């Protein structure tokens, strides 16, 4: 899968928000707003990156179920943590704010990744 294909896959699986243009605005797994055009832009509060749910350092790869769009500060905050991780950015209304929260990868995805990676 090319980098562009990974980007498109992740965007297409990010959370669609009713009332917003799904082709340009979505939310990440932590509920932070992301703008499609801001991919890779760490100078934007709406910038985002491709996250590996099961980190590469632990043996993860570009298996599609292991990829998702994540606001860049949330991706940095998550780092190599799995299955529990911390976010740094949350949405409040139609804006992003700095706010930490704890998340756990859902059980069904953990099971699927465990089977795929034989962990």
Predicted regions: what is each one?
Residues 1-2, 59:
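Generic structural signal for short, solvent-exposed loop/turn connectors between secondary structure elements
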Residues 31, 40, 56-62, 111:
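A generic structural micro-environment signature
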Residues 45-58, 62-73:
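Histidine-centered catalytic micro-motifs used for acid/base chemistry in nuclease
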Residues 27, 70, 84-88:
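Flexible domain-boundary/linker segments
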Residues 2-48, 71:
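Short cysteine-rich loop/turn motifs with clustered Cys
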Residues 60-65, 76-119:
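Polybasic, low-complexity binding patches
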């Amino acid at each position: 899968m090319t980098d562009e294909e990974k980007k498109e896959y992740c965007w297409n699986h990010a959370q669609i928000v009713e009332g917003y243009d799904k082709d340009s605005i979505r939310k990440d797994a932590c509920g932070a707003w992301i703008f499609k055009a801001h991919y890779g832009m760490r100078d934007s509060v709406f910038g985002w990156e491709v996250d590996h749910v099961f980190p590469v350092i632990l043996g993860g790869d570009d298996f599609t179920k292991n990829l998702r769009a994540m606001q860049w500060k949330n991706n940095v905050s998550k780092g190599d943590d799995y299955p529990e991780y911390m976010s740094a950015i949350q949405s409040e209304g139609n804006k992003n704010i700095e706010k930490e929260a704890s998340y756990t990868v859902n059980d069904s995805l953990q099971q699927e990744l465990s089977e795929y990676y034989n962990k």
